[in-house]
Amino acid sequence: MKPVSLAKYIQKSPFLTKLLLPISNAYVHLSGYRKYGLRYDDLMLEENDDTQKALSRLPKMESYDRVYRIRRAMQLSIENKILPKSEWTKPEEDYHYLRPVLAEVIAERKEREAFDALIVKKPETQAHATSSPAHAH
């Protein structure tokens, strides 16, 4: 079953956007990942094969930065600390860097699965379907 998302519908409606944006911002603030210098895509689980493939496709510097952010956040968590407010991830820095790559990987996998499940039937030719007069007795 495909998960239902209302995001596109909400983004198209100025009223709903205006209504829900403060709630969204409050949720992001309460989740606290920006206080550790993380981006939203840093929170994605890596145990998934698709995510692993997407991570391998990231540019080297983006991958390095991701690992650095995660390790720094883990260290801060162990020490029960957060970053100084000046070092928190700013909203404009919190963009999706992994999701587009992951969407591409998933689309490729689904296409491959559909292609692998494809059944090719060889059409019968007219020559084989009717018997030739030479063979008729």
Swiss-Prot record:
Q: What is its main location?
A: mitochondrion
Q: What is this protein called?
A: Cytochrome b-c1 complex subunit 7
State the Gene Ontology BP annotations: mitochondrial electron transport, ubiquinol to cytochrome c; proton transmembrane transport
Free-text function comment from the UniProt entry: Component of the ubiquinol-cytochrome c oxidoreductase, a multisubunit transmembrane complex that is part of the mitochondrial electron transport chain which drives oxidative phosphorylation.
This protein's GO cellular component annotations are: mitochondrial inner membrane; mitochondrion; respiratory chain complex III
The protein's matches in Gene3D superfamilies, at most eight in alphabetical order, are given as: Cytochrome b-c1 complex subunit 7 (1.10.1090.10)
| Pfam families documented for this protein | UCR_14kD
- How does this polypeptide assemble, per the annotation? Component of the ubiquinol-cytochrome c oxidoreductase (cytochrome b-c1 complex, complex III, CIII), a multisubunit enzyme composed of 3 respiratory subunits cytochrome b, cytochrome c1 and Rieske protein, 2 core protein subunits, and additional low-molecular weight protein subunits. The complex exists as an obligatory dimer and forms supercomplexes (SCs) in the inner mitochondrial membrane with cytochrome c oxidase (complex IV, CIV).
Q: Which family does it belong to?
A: Belongs to the UQCRB/QCR7 family.
By its UniProt entry, which InterPro entries does this protein fall under? QCR7, QCR7_sf
Alphabetic keyword roster: Electron transport, Membrane, Mitochondrion, Mitochondrion inner membrane, Respiratory chain, Transport
Q: Which gene encodes it?
A: qcr7
In which compartments does the protein localize?
Mitochondrion inner membrane
Q: Where are the transmembrane segments?
A: none
* The UniProt record lists the keyword Transport: yes
How the protein sits in the membrane?
Peripheral membrane protein
